[in-house]
A protein has these predicted regions:
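Bulky hydrophobic/aromatic packing residues
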Residues: 8, 12, 60, 69-70, ...
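Generic alpha-helical secondary structure signal
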Residues: 7-8, 55, 138
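Residue-level signal for alpha-helical context at structural boundaries
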Residues: 18, 22, 69-72, 163
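Catalytic beta-strand-to-alpha-helix segment of the class III nucleotidyl cyclase homology domain
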Residues: 93-171
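Catalytic NTP-binding/metal-coordinating core of nucleotidyl cyclase/transferase enzymes
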Residues: 31-105
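Residue-level detector of functional hotspots within protein domains
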Residues: 27-29, 34-37, 70, 78, ...
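Regulatory cytosolic signal-relay segments
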Residues: 1-38, 65
Length: 171
């Protein structure tokens, strides 16, 4: 039975791959560039500082619980127009059309001094929006900015610093 199941599965997968290669995958074709939407957004990445050490100290299951609480605290504190678009491990990607509002959120989130500490990086620009997610150079830059943040820090690009809300200053 195992042999036939493996052979059937392989044939089924190969058949689907051939259909997709021939362009017959249920009528869905890859999106043309002009079907993608460019939108001006602020993109933030927030992750837990010292997550590797945390998993070693607490174990995987408790570390996952910590990540779930972290992401829930992000989602519950976001301005109404912002949202968590995805999580990757201990990192959350947050997007908002309101750049000053996302800056205010990042600063206030870090002021909470949660443990373990977060690192947040922000950038803004024209990103590609496709099927509920954001892509492109601006998103990649936001991710790299977050990687430069230390525990408890918010690091922004020059573009974001120029658009910061009144009352917020950056060193």
């Amino acid at each position: 039975h195992q042999y036939y199941l493996r052979v059937f599965t392989e044939q089924d997968v190969i058949g689907h791959m051939e259909e997709l290669a021939a362009g017959a995958g249920g009528g869905e074709q890859p999106k043309e560039r002009d079907e993608l939407t460019r939108v001006r957004v602020a993109v933030a990445f927030a992750d837990l500082a010292g997550y590797t050490r945390l998993t070693e100290e607490l174990g995987d299951a408790r570390a996952v619980d910590t990540v779930e609480r972290f992401v829930a605290s992000i989602a519950s504190s976001l301005p109404s127009e912002a949202r968590v678009t995805k999580t990757i491990g201990d990192e959350a990607m947050i997007v908002s059309p309101d750049i000053p509002a996302l800056v205010r959120w990042a600063v206030s989130f870090q002021a909470q001094e949660i443990e373990p500490s977060a690192r947040i990086g922000l950038h803004c620009g024209q990103a590609l929006f496709y099927e509920g997610d954001y892509y492109g150079r601006e998103v990649n830059l936001a991710s790299r900015v977050a990687a430069r943040a230390a525990a408890g820090e918010v690091v922004v690009t020059g573009t974001v610093a120029e658009l910061k809300p009144p009352g917020v200053s950056f060193d």
